[in-house]
């Protein structure tokens, strides 16, 4: 498992511009399983990672959502290679749950148009939609899972609320922390489109692995609430005990 995650993120750690690809035999096998997987709206989830298309964005902070989808796809043997709904899409099984994995190929600010098409094509209700994306306000390599909320300044999520969910904010999301730039004069747009240094890349390997596990738990158990509780508890700020008062 760790080897697969390392493969997915090797573009982050080394600055390479190509993400991991499955062997041809594995892609063929996964595609056959995907074609045979029927979409049942009662049990089908759409897990959509946000990012920007094109190799020049591989390994950037803003593409962490894509990295999580690649990690899930690699471990579960789902080929996310079908071009539809303005995205790269793969359909398969995780446990007994049918899942649509997707990476919108619009640019980040237009992600909602692709998400809208995916929801319509695969008949995905909002309570079976899970969005994975980078978050500036979550500390580096930490995770937060939420059942609803505002866009928090993230243009991809803003687009989903505007274009896909008709203003409704009650859809699940996994926020992968990228932190704020250490230099406050660095423009945010430059920061999110930059690549991780080696030290941060090592931390992000673990973060992507944790995000993959959290998403897989949701799908295996068909239960968002329990997975969210476990994830958020793991990354909850540790309480600092007050020093004991000396006895008088």
What is each residue range found by the language model?
Residues 2-148, 158-175, 181-187, 208-238, ...:
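Nucleotide and nucleotide-moiety/phosphate-recognizing core
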């Amino acid at each position: 498992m760790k080897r697969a995650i390392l493969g997915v993120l090797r573009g982050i750690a080394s600055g390479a511009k190509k993400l991991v690809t499955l062997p041809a035999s594995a892609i063929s096998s996964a595609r056959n399983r995907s074609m045979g997987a029927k979409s049942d709206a009662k049990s089908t989830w759409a897990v959509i990672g946000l990012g920007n298309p094109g190799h020049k964005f591989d390994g950037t902070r803003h593409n962490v959502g894509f990295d999580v989808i690649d990690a899930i796809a690699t471990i579960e043997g789902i080929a996310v290679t079908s071009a539809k709904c303005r995205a790269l899409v793969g359909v398969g099984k995780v446990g007994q749950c049918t899942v649509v994995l997707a990476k919108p190929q619009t640019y980040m600010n237009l992600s909602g148009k692709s998400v809208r098409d995916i929801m319509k094509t695969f008949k995905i209700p909002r309570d079976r939609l899970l969005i994975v994306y980078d978050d500036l306000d979550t500390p580096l390599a930490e995770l937060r899972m939420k059942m609803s909320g505002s866009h928090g300044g993230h243009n991809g999520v803003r687009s989903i609320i505007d274009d896909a969910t008709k203003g409704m904010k009650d859809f699940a999301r996994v926020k992968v922390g990228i932190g704020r730039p250490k230099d406050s004069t660095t423009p945010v747009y430059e920061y999110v489109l930059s690549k991780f240094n080696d030290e941060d890349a090592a931390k992000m390997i673990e973060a992507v692995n944790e995000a993959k596990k959290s998403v897989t738990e949701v799908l295996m158990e068909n239960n968002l609430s329990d997975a969210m509780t476990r994830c958020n508890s793991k990354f909850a700020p540790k309480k600092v005990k007050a020093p004991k008062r000396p006895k008088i």
